[in-house]
Amino acid sequence: MAADLIVGIQWGDEGKGKIVDLLAQEYNVVCRYQGGHNAGHTIVVDGKTIALHLIPSGILNPKAVNIIGNGVVVSPAALLKEMEQFDNLDGRLLISDKAHLIFKYHEEIDRAKERLRGKNAIGTTGRGIGPAYSDKVSRQGHRIGELKDIDTLHKKILDYFETNKIYFEALGISFPSENELRMELQRYQEVLMPYVVDTTNYLWDLLELGEAKILLEGAQGTMLDIDHGTYPYVTSSNTIAAGACTGLGLAPKDIGKVIGIAKAYCTRVGNGPFPTEDNGEDGERLRKQGHEFGTTTGRPRRCGWFDAVAAKYASRINGCDEMALMKLDVLDGFEKIKVASKYLYEGEEIDYMVSDLENVEPIYLEFEGWDRVEGIRSWKDLPLNAKRYIEAIEELIETKISLISTSPDRADTIKR
């Protein structure tokens, strides 16, 4: 039995957490395969809001095993804080021994480099994600499995400090004392090591037996992918569906159905091109009605209309079999609603993605709005204009929309 996959097809914050939480009731294994605690999922169940950054959204299913894969960069401090929200995680949380660690100095490097970039800042969350991935690629990172031998890991980190001493001093970053570092590592070892296993072999065994239903959960979104996003204004990992293979140790044939997640409009956090951004009254209204502030940083998100060109590109690169359209209710009350169906690029109309997205202008289709869809749970009860809007998006992105969210609550979801 293959593993199904959920992936964001915009700039992140699409509402993946709600869909994973909804579908996780049907799966007994949920896996996270990339990113770090820069990502944030907000889930509302029975009126209670839960924010997750590292632990997969399946944690709310008491029968599900949740896996943090090798492609994730893990801040032990952030993970420990997140774990405190739950009473008992024994047997419900597994962490890959190959996942790389984020330490405080990674966060300090991140923030220092952003300051140095000035007006050219990328707009990172300052959580140390990029520096941790940079250490991983340059073969000087530290993996969570190394916590089993504190003496060796302690020495390796001190050697790392010595090797990078000039760099750290140039950035104004101080080192922790040897004793502070050792105490920190001992705490992480004590709490986290009981959850650390070879998750790749664990998943292989499950797939071979064919009895488990496995769901793979991406973080951020396609347009933030390190290779296929709006570089350099991207995250430091492969956010697309293919990242699940390297981020969990799976083969392409192990991937089953791919479900893309998109908002009924677009948002972006941080800097970088955003063709459909609306800096006027409509954009501000989207932000207010959608409560568009980052789960991780609290920063106001940039808001704009649905970009069908970007969504079609993302659907194709991820191989989406179907799509979930989130936060349709945020568009309630708009007299007119826009969708970018094409771009104007170098004097020509195009319907495909380009690498220099900052040089395109959106060409819009305009739709009549509707009064209210909030809380609607069946297709037949949707206003006609809302149905027309959804069907137009389906046609433009060439992907079926099978799920429609009409409020943050898990139950307010239309299945087609």
Swiss-Prot record:
Keywords: Cytoplasm, GTP-binding, Ligase, Magnesium, Metal-binding, Nucleotide-binding, Purine biosynthesis. Mg(2+) binds at residues 13, 40. Its cofactor is Mg(2+). Substrate binds at residues 295-301. InterPro entries: Adenylosuccin_syn_GTP-bd, Adenylosuccin_syn_Lys_AS, Adenylosuccinate_synth_dom1, Adenylosuccinate_synth_dom2, Adenylosuccinate_synth_dom3, Adenylosuccinate_synthetase, P-loop_NTPase. SUPFAM superfamilies: P-loop containing nucleoside triphosphate hydrolases (SSF52540). Its EC number is 6.3.4.4. IMP binds at residues 13-16, 38-41, 125, 139, 220, 235, 299. It is an enzyme of class 6 (ligase). One of its GO terms (cellular component) is cytoplasm. HAMAP family: Adenylosucc_synth. Plays an important role in the de novo pathway of purine nucleotide biosynthesis. Catalyzes the first committed step in the biosynthesis of AMP from IMP. This is Adenylosuccinate synthetase.
